[in-house]
Amino acid sequence: YYFEKEPLGNAGALFKLKDKLTEDFLLLNADAIFDIDFNRFIKYHKEKGGLVTLFTHPNSHPYDSGLIFADTNNTVLRWSAKEDERPAYYRNRVNAGLHVISPNILETEITTAKVDLDRQLLKPLAGSGKMFCYDSPEYVKDMGTPDRYVAVCRDYREGKVSGKNLKNKQKAIFLDRDGTLNK
């Protein structure tokens, strides 16, 4: 653990722990509830070999979330923060706040003690070929507002949180080209 005497932002403490972080690590936002297959997420990160892998998915509030634009290989090309100008039409793919990060990212030149993870470390990696997105239907929800917290509590009680974990069998319907249901 690292105890901050002064607030260091959501990534400043990482630089204080730089010598202790010797292998890829998970960085998880504290205002999210999730139930995901971490082994699958980490395996994907290792296969891609980037500095960072973002857990991405569509959400109910892309207007106040970081939009992620990627190529067909899921290499992140552009990161549009909520305050950035956005195109009129975009894919609802957002950073869910779960990350697998290589300690090599801490070689980034940072001149301030207070560090913003998204703006100072992640967003500048977009387009470098070193950051990938992991698209998943698993349950990850930001519960940082009262309405979102109420929705997450309801989803938890109804079993939606654990039910979407990819370790569990998922229901699916397959249609052939003429729209016929197949068993």
Give the role of each language-model region:
Residues 171-172, 177-183:
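Active-site neighborhood of HAD-like aspartate-dependent phosphohydrolases
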Residues 25-26, 33, 39-46, 59-62, ...:
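Catalytic-core segments of class I nucleotidyltransferases/pyrophosphorylases
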Residues 24, 52, 130-131, 172:
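Residue-level preference for the first positions of well-ordered beta-strands
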Residues 72-73, 178:
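Residue-level recognition of short loop/turn positions
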Residues 65, 96, 169-171:
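Short loop/turn microsegments at loop-to-beta-strand junctions
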Residues 21, 100-102, 181-182:
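Short, basic/glycine-rich phosphate-binding loops at helix/coil junctions
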Residues 162-174:
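Long, charged amphipathic helices and adjacent flexible linkers at domain junctions
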